């Protein structure tokens, strides 16, 4: 019997692969992946006028009511197809394109979608707006017209034959084909119950669900710093809004009071029945499409935030919280007192020496950087000075004997070398730092080693510096660990605090940068360097993700530059090139590719220790 079942499963899998391949409208041999062109498409999108904070991401398949042929109906395919769309946060393109039988055409289609998205605005009518954007793009760049015509002609050959469609669908198909050939020539489109076959050269409306009708959502910038209910999933699944009709109608087949009477005789402990199931979202698992019903306000009760540890095991707070602003790119305004930042000391920290494994490297670094102290140095080849520069005089004598007599300084002068530099290092301590880089190193281990070696370097140079770490749990709880302030000396107490660091929560980067800017701005040194060590994008549990977090961080970096600071980012995220140039500038960051580079990359070290 088991053998029969295996044969049936094998035959079923073979049939499934066969029928899906035959029913697929794609050309697998000419498939082009978005990942291979994502960087170039991002550059093209921004160069053509697209918003700098908009990223290029993969689009999920969308439900479309299409007319499918017999093979597609038997295979159960083409019910969901990926289409391109754009909103204020992302340009969503299909994860791969195999629309055309040639690789070059699929690549040109990706480029065309990026170009038309840069021209696109708010969509009011799908067909008329796409015609208008296409017409404007071709008028602005006439050299694109031959390439566009090739894409259109190849696309029209793959579309359904209007002669084989019902009258209403045939009329709509003819109008769409005319709109593709001559953009702007069609203003009225026939109504049809079925959607036309996807037009791969056009953008589709964004998948917006509208504002959720949750009564406990706090309006941005208003209200107190309250903690919203937990359990809100960050997973991006397909969704549709439906009316909650569970309270209407229905036949009552039992008496509800009987349930209470029977439960009184059952020996069950129901003290935990009313608590919130924190794993409910995980247990339900991902779905292609979910139903989002309006949520009703629940009754009041005692709400405990189990995300934070007990006070006996938590970091030690330093004073009251600090209210900080936050940039809202949607409203284009700085929301005052929107974030609460709490300065803290690492819990359980004790004075500790430098780990033995780092001692040889630390000694070598101290020897390399001790010569940069504010000591008096001899300047050679000066036009005047207190002593004769014998090497310069010897070179001058040899050149004169050979017939050359170039003017040069023949004296040496001793001057004070003043660096006049203050530096603050800000380390990202989010929960993602608990991940492993390889079999031996975690991200938090690399961060700790970087902090220790950075402290050894600057203590050898003698520059004033400070060390801080940060993580966050929504805007009400931005936690900033003080490892070493500018007033404190660097010693075993600071080393112990660094070695006691643990992964925290999330990464509200803008608030941490603003507080670091305030601390560093109070220094009297002429040059002020703000170093940020991180492992990924800014994000938090609330609205602080995607473009919102990137825009707020960029605004915080710009505020720091306006105050005369030099922000510089050090990251281990291999995808940092997609967003860090926008936040810190093309030369404002560097990438650590190997854990052995935790002793700080050369670019950051040169910028941190270069004499003023």
Curated annotation (Swiss-Prot):
Disulphide linkage map: none
Region (Disordered): 220-246
SUPFAM superfamilies tied to this protein: vWA-like
Regions that span the bilayer: none
Highest rank taxon of the organism: Bacteria
Function: Component of the anaerobic respiratory chain that transforms nitrate to dinitrogen (denitrification).
Boundaries of every VWFA domain copy: 420-609
Protein name per the record: Protein NorD
Gene designation: norD
Database matches in PROSITE patterns: VWFA
């Amino acid at each position: 019997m088991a053998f029969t079942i295996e044969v049936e499963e094998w035959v079923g899998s073979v049939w499934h692969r066969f029928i899906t391949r035959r029913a697929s409208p794609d050309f697998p041999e000419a498939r082009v992946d978005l990942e291979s062109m994502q960087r170039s498409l991002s550059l093209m999108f921004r160069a053509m006028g697209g918003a700098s904070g908009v990223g290029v991401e993969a689009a999920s398949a969308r439900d479309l009511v299409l007319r499918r042929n017999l093979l597609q109906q038997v295979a159960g395919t083409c019910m969901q197809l990926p289409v391109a769309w754009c909103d204020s946060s992302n340009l969503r393109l299909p994860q791969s394109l195999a629309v055309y039988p040639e690789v070059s055409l699929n690549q040109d289609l990706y480029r065309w979608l990026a170009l038309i998205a840069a021209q696109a605005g708010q969509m009011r009518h799908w067909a008329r707006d796409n015609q208008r954007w296409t017409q404007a793009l071709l008028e602005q760049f006439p050299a694109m017209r031959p390439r566009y015509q090739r894409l259109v002609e190849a696309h029209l050959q793959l579309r359904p034959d209007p002669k084989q469609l019902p009258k209403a669908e045939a009329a709509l198909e003819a109008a769409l084909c005319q709109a593709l050939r001559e953009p702007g020539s069609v203003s009225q489109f026939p109504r049809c119950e079925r959607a036309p076959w996807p037009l791969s050269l056009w953008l589709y409306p964004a998948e917006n669900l509208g504002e959720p009708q949750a009564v406990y959502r706090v309006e941005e910038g208003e209200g107190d710093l309250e903690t919203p209910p937990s359990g809100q999933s960050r997973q991006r699944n397909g969704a549709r809004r439906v009316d909650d009709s569970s309270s209407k109608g229905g036949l009552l087949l039992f008496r509800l009071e009987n349930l209470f009477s029977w439960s009184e005789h059952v020996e069950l402990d129901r003290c935990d029945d009313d608590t919130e199931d924190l794993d409910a979202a995980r247990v339900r698992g991902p779905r292609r499409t979910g139903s989002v019903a309006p949520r009703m306000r629940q009754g009041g009760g005692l709400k405990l935030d189990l995300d934070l540890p007990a006070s006996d095991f938590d970091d030690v707070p330093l004073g009251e919280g600090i209210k900080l602003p936050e940039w809202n790119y949607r409203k284009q305004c700085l929301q005052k007192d929107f974030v609460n930042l709490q300065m803290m000391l690492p819990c359980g920290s004790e004075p500790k020496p430098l780990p033995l494994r780092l001692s040889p490297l630390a000694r070598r670094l101290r020897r390399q950087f001790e010569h940069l102290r504010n000591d008096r140095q001899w300047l050679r080849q000066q036009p005047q000075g207190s002593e004769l520069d014998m090497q310069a005089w010897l070179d001058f004598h040899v050149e004169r004997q050979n017939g050359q007599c170039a003017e040069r300084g023949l004296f040496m002068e001793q001057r004070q070398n003043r660096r006049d530099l203050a530096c603050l290092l800000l380390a990202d301590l989010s929960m993602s730092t608990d991940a492993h880089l390889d079999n031996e190193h975690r991200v938090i281990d690399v961060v700790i080693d970087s902090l220790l070696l950075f402290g050894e370097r600057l203590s050898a140079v003698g520059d004033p510096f400070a060390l801080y770490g940060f993580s966050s749990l929504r805007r009400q709880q931005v936690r900033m660990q003080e490892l070493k302030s500018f007033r404190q000396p660097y010693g075993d107490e600071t080393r112990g605090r660094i070695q006691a660091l643990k992964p925290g929560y999330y990464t509200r980067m803008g608030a941490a940068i603003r507080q670091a800017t305030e601390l560093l701005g109070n220094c009297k040194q002429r040059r002020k360097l703000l170093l940020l060590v991180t492992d990924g994008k800014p994000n938090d549990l609330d609205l602080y993700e995607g473009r919102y977090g990137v825009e707020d961080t960029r605004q915080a970096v710009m505020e720091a530059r306006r105050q005369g600071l030099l922000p510089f980012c050090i990251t281990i995220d291999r995808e940092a090139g997609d967003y860090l140039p926008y936040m810190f500038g093309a030369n404002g960051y560097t990438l650590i590719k190997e854990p052995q580079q935790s002793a700080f990359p050369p670019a950051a070290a040169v910028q941190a220790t270069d004499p003023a």
